[in-house]
């Protein structure tokens, strides 16, 4: 039996005294050790659930000169040139992509349709989905799945009113299994000659604004252990194509979110939730990836989430502003190094 007592003082002046009593078995402690989580960390997590999480105090809104940098054309060109010069000197730049996010929330409306007591589209979303289904990047793959599993094409299934069979083949394991895959492995954008996953769009971006003068592009994806092999397989299948297209060489690495950053799950009474007798842990949010980020050896790292991508026709502003931001970072880095030299 472990007892934990603490005193909290929050920025808003609220002070909370609380006592926490949590019972952990030797097997629980072994689980904590396996994950690399100290028992006191677990106790602190439980205490936070009990006391609540205070809102941050907002000091002011961001504005030009107060968190927002406004550049004229001359300044913009200066930072663009600074970035291009930095890349020519072959500094190591890494594109860091959190890619463990599941796609299940993207399909919540389709899951609702599957479980609904009606069989044809009723909501605006459902009607729009089926009216536009041929425009989705996954359409051809889904059509093949329907032909294989149902013996009929998407068009035939819709014409016969079997809408749910189409959705089932999209979301479930018998078909494309999109309901269980991470966003990075989904076909996101449709092109005239091919369709791209979100991961492939990041390969494209990396070549456009993070390639060194000798064509080296470093991209690091953080993924779940469950889907690591799938990501590696997709890279093995697609990397050479994008290297030829953009005249670059990719150095792609992966890491998994560290289990030591997991958070214990609680029940309605904020007590440890157990599954099959063991405390259940859930992965921490993207903030937990700070440790993965810290492990990256690079001078400048661009961080961008896996689903924050656009098709090629919309990429120009993204590439331009990434280069500008890179130039701003180089300017700040130079200034910091100058101060360090002065202090020495």
Where are these regions (language model features)?
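Residue-identity detector for glycine
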Residues: 11-13
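Domain-scale recognition of functional cores that engage charged ligands
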Residues: 24, 29-32, 51-54, 58-344
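Intrinsically disordered, low-structural-confidence terminal and linker regions
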Residues: 20-47
